[in-house]
Amino acid sequence: ASDVYKRQIQSYAPVLTAWKEFEPYEVVATTYQAISGAGKTFADWPEMVGNIIPYIGGEEEKSEKEPLRLWGKVEDGVIVPAQSPVITCQCIRVPVLNGHTAAVFVKFKKKPTKEELIDRLVHFSGEPQRLELPSAPKQFIQYLEEDNRPQVALDVNYENGMGISVGRLREDTVYDWKFVGLSHNTVRG
């Protein structure tokens, strides 16, 4: 599962990992994926200018299953996926060169406060940070308070493109919380 963040889940799986102690059990996500994720530029895909494509073959299934592999365990040399959270996802190709954005809704078994969620995000670190690897972002996840963030134009290169930007964290009427995550798909991937 080492390449799991290389895909479309990199804008939300690390966020959910930071919140694991609150036991997220149901997730709805829509990803808005840059054309570079398809190996394209606007020069060789001009029909994407001013357009969206509401289907990316195979991405939705990966978006729902790969986080469970990431959070699973190894038994007898085989990855056994986690059983929770249940994830449903739609993946949309958007006219952006670099940067995958995700709009995510989450239900928790132990509903946290907004302050607890933000605290876990800004203090989250993993093995790359502990090992102080040269490409590891010093602060893996940043939280942006402004209502109009994260934005691809302003935030995709956070921590040299290796970090994740999160914003728009607010309570939801159907789920517990919702947020928007952004990551650089070609630098992180």
Describe the role of every protein-language-model region:
Residues 185-189:
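Flexible, small-/acidic-enriched active-site or ligand-binding loops
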Residues 6-24:
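Alpha-helical support elements that line or immediately flank enzyme active sites
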Residues 25-177:
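C-terminal substrate-binding/catalytic lobe of Rossmann-fold NAD(P)-dependent oxidoreductases
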Residues 6, 31-33, 183:
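Short, structured patches in soluble enzyme cores that scaffold and shape functional sites
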Residues 177-183:
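Short, well-ordered beta-strand elements
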Residues 1-5:
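Short, small-residue-biased leader/transition segments that mark boundaries at the very start
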